[in-house]
Amino acid sequence: TKTEKNLWEAFAGESQARNKYTFFASVAKKEGYEQLAAIFEETAANEKEHAKMWFKALHGGSIPDTMTCLEMAAGGEHDEWTEMYPRMAKEAKEEGFPQLAALFTMVAQIEKEHEERYRELAENLKNNQVFAREEQQVWQCRNCGYTYIGKSAPLKCPVCAHPQSYFELKKHNY
């Protein structure tokens, strides 16, 4: 319907405005205009709420459950790396913008990794492996940093009392 098309347009417009205003706030802060930065940030928060309202309207009045969100995210990332960015890279190259073509190609690779991450997370959710694994793991509380070794994360952090939802597998990336 025209109304659905308008909802998608409103969602896209508000989403883009939010990002622009966040970028503008950074510039204003850098240039020493704290009040102007705060106004951009406030407006960005307003735009986020407007986008959320339209997104909910597009999805029956609420944001879908986590599994659906993971599937939607993976699908969006898939379209970006297989269709959108390759097309944009080709067009940029044809029009004489090799640097932009290279950036589109590199970002496509990032989007592929995003898709893979979302699909793996969806599998973890489907298989009840978000907070439990078959082998011992190091779990870390995202709130206070407490670590626990076990097959599943504690139901409650013994240090800060945050629920199991705050635990994740501890990352070693250094």
Feature names for model-found ranges:
Residues 1-174:
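Non-heme di-metal
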